[in-house]
Amino acid sequence: MIECDAPAVALAPTPALHAAIAGACRRIAPLWPLKNFVAVNPFMGFSGQSFHATCATLHRVARLETLMPRAFYREAIRSGTIERADLAAALAAAPADWCLPTEVGELLKLADNDKTVRKHPAVVATVAEVLTELAAGDRHVARTAFMTDEISRWCAAYFDEGQSVWRMPARGLRPYAAWRASVRYDRNPEAMGIARFRELVAELPEDYVAAIATVVDRLGVPARAIEDYLHQALLEIGGWAAYARYLMWDHELAGDRDDTLEQLLAIRVVWGYALFVQRTDAEFREAWRRAMEQAALPPLDDKLGGDPDLCINMVLQEAYEIAFRRRLLHRLGQSPAAQASGARPAVQAAFCIDVRSEVYRRAMESISSAVETIGFAGFFGFPIEFVPIGHITGRAHCPVLLRPQFTVCEAVDGTSEDEDSEILVMRLLRRRVRKAWKSFKLSAVSSFIYVETAGLLFAGKILSDSLAVTRTVHDPNTDGLDDAVIGRLGPRISPRLVGGRATGFDQAQRVAMAEAVLRAMSMTGPFARLVMLTGHGSTSVNNPHAAGLDCGACGGNTGEANARVAAAILNDSDVRAGLRDRGIDIPEDTFFLGCLHDTTTDEIKLYDLERLPASHREDLRVLRELLAKATSLTRLERATLLGVAGRADAEQRVVTRSRDWAQVRPEWGLAGNASFIAAPRARTRGIDLGGRAFLHEYDWRQDKDFATLQLIMTAPMVVASWINLQYYGSTVNNAAFGAGNKVLHNVAGTIGVLEGNAGDLKVGLPWQSVHDGTRFVHEPLRLAVLIEAPLEAIGRVIAQNSGVRELVDNAWLHLYAISGQGRVSHRYRSGLQWQAIDPQS
C-alpha cells in the first residue's frame, strides 16, 4: 500500500480492472424513475448464480440480510403454517455442506435460538465501513454519512428531470467531469474537516477509469477482491447507482453503451479515498491492513457452510416456501379438471395477468356462468409509444424488456385540422402559464411574498383536498385540456407522418398484430357478442410511487391506450377479413370494447361506446349490471385486507382512499403475489386464489411450434418473477432493498425519493406496501410457476433461453408442469431434469 501523502501517479487501467468495474456494475439492479416506476428484481445482477449463493455473497460483501429474522419462522412453525413434514422436506433437500442436523427435532432447537455461534465469512470492507466500525466518537461516522449525503445531493442536481428551478451549470458534461468541475467550488468537505479535498480530487487523473485504478492501487485492495470492493462501494450509494444502472439498461436496449454508472463509481471511490487520507493514525491503518488481509481470503460465494446461522435460516425459508406450495397444489388438486364447454359465452373479458385482476375475474364468474375471463399481459401485445397531445415524444407502453415497435399519437375525435391546432395551442399556453406561476412561487425572493399575500386564498382548496373532495394536483394526462375535449380523447391508429415519424398502423401491420395477439391469448373462437379488453391503472394522490400501482406490462403506465388500440384494430372489418384468411373467424356481431380497471376503486371504465352498434345496447345494459355487481363484490373482498370490512360504508371507504392525500395505503398493489399459472382458465375457475396468482391464458393445443409458450416464459414469467422478487426484497430487508417509510419521503429530481431530507435515493417498495403496521401483508416467497404444456416443450424453451434457464436452474423460482388432464404432475429440478409428483401426496 502506498502511503497516503505520495503523489497521485496515474496508473494505466488493466483489462482485469475493466472487467472488475463492469462486473461490479452488472451486480446492480436498475431503478426506473418515478414517472414509469416498475418492479425490478433487486437480485438481477446475481441471476447467474443460485439464490442460496447470492444470499451468501451479499452477506459476505456487504453483510446484507436476505432472509427473514428467525423469529418470523418460529411464529410460522408455532401457528402451523410450517408443519413438521415441511421441515423434514427442507432438510432432505439441503446440500450436505450446509452441515445441518438430520432430525426435525434438532432443527427446531436451533430455530429457537437466535444466538448460535456465527463464524463470519470474509467481508470486503470499504473505507467508510472501516471508519464506521472503528467509530472513535461520532466524528468519523458523521463523515461517512456526509459522503453519502454529498454524493446524493450532487446526483439529484445532475440528474434532475425538471423539479429544480435552477439547473446545474455542468450538466452538459459527463458525470465524472461534471463532478470534478463542481468540486472546484465546493468547500463543504473542508468545512467537515476533510482537509485538501479539492486539491486531492484535482491531483487524481481526469479519466475516470484511471482514477479508479489509482485509488484501488493506493488503497492496496487485493486483486481478487477488487470487484467485490467496487460492488460494496456502489451499494453504499445503491439508490443512485441503481438509477445510473437504469440509464445503462435503457441505452443497451437501444443497442448503445452508457458509462454513467462507471463514472458514478469513480466519484464514490474518490470520495472514499479522500476519507482514507484523513486518517494517518496507527489504529486506523492497522484496521485497514486487517480488512485488506480479510478481503484477500478465498471467497465463499457458493458455500453457505461457512455461516451456520445463514444455513439454518435458509432451510427455514425453504420449509416456509414448501408449506405454501403444498397448500397451493392441494387447492388446485381439489378442483375438478374442467374443460371449456365450447359454447358461445355471453361476455368475454380479457384482463391483465396482474394478481389484482384475479379477484375481479373471480367475482365476474361467480355472478354468471356465461362469463368467460381471460388473462394476458396488460399491454395486449401492442408495444407502442403513446404520444399525448402537445408532446414530441411519448412513453413506452410495453414491458421494459421490450422497445416500442409502433408510435401512436393521442388525438381528439371528430376534429378538423384547425380545431386540432387550437386545442394544441391552448394546452401549451396553459402549461406555460402554470410553469411560470410555479417558478414565481418557488423562486428565492417571490416565494416569501407569495405565501404572505396569497396563502390564505388557498384555505378552501386545502380543506377540499383534505376531505378528498378534489385532487391535490391536476391529472397530468389531461392537464391543460377542457372537459369537453377530454371526453373525446383517444389513440389515433390510422397511419400518418408526424414530425417526420411514422405513426399508426398500416393494414398489413394491423392484421399481423391482431393475429399474433389473439393466438397468444389462445382466443381463436368462439367469440362473444361483447369482448372486453381491460387494461388497468390506479388512482391515488400525493403518492410519488403511483406509477408502481399502474400496469407494469405497460411500462408503469395505465393500460387504456393499449386496450383501445387493440379494440379498434380488432373491430376493423378489413382486419377481420384478413384474419379469416389466417384461420380466425370473428363473427360480424362481435364487438371489442377497450376498458380500464381501476385497481384502487375496482371501477371499470368503458371507452368508445359511441362506436357500439345499436344492436348491442341491450348487451351493454346487461354488462353494466354485471360489472356493478362484480365491483361491489371485489370491493368487499379487498375491504378485509384494507381493514375497513364489516362497516356499512366499507365500499365507499375503499373509494375514498383513492382521493385521500394522507393515505399511505390507497391499495395493496401486488402484495401477496406468490404464483404464476399459464393454463386454460378452466383449470382454475372456481378456485379462490386470494388475489395472489398471476393468471395467463394458455392452451398448448393451439400453440403452433410452441411459439406462444416461449413468449410466455421469456416475457410475462420473467416480469412476474421481477415483481415477486421486488416484493420479497422489500419485505426481508426494507432498509437495503426497499424504500423505507413513505411518510418521510421527499422527491428528488422527479427521479426517486429520499427518506427524509438527505441520504441515498431509495429503491424498491415503501414499508407501507408490504406491512400494515402490525403484520406483514406480503409473504416473502419465491414465485411458484405452473405451466400446462408437454415437458419436452417446456424443456426446449429452457434450453434455448439462457435467462430463463438461470431463473429455473438457480432456484429464483419454482417451476411445475401441469398435465393434459389438468393435474400438477412434475417439478423441475435443474439441469433439464424433472421429478414426478405423487398425485396422492
Curated annotation (Swiss-Prot):
Cross-referenced Pfam families: DabA
Cofactor(s) the record lists: Zn(2+)
Membrane topology (UniProt): Peripheral membrane protein
Positions with a binding annotation for Zn(2+): 352, 354, 536, 551
InterPro entries in the cross-refs: DabA
Record-level Gene Ontology MF annotations: zinc ion binding
GO cellular component, one term: plasma membrane
Family the UniProt entry places it in: Belongs to the inorganic carbon transporter (TC 9.A.2) DabA family.
Function: Part of an energy-coupled inorganic carbon pump.
Family annotation (HAMAP family): DabA
Name of the molecule in the record: Probable inorganic carbon transporter subunit DabA 1
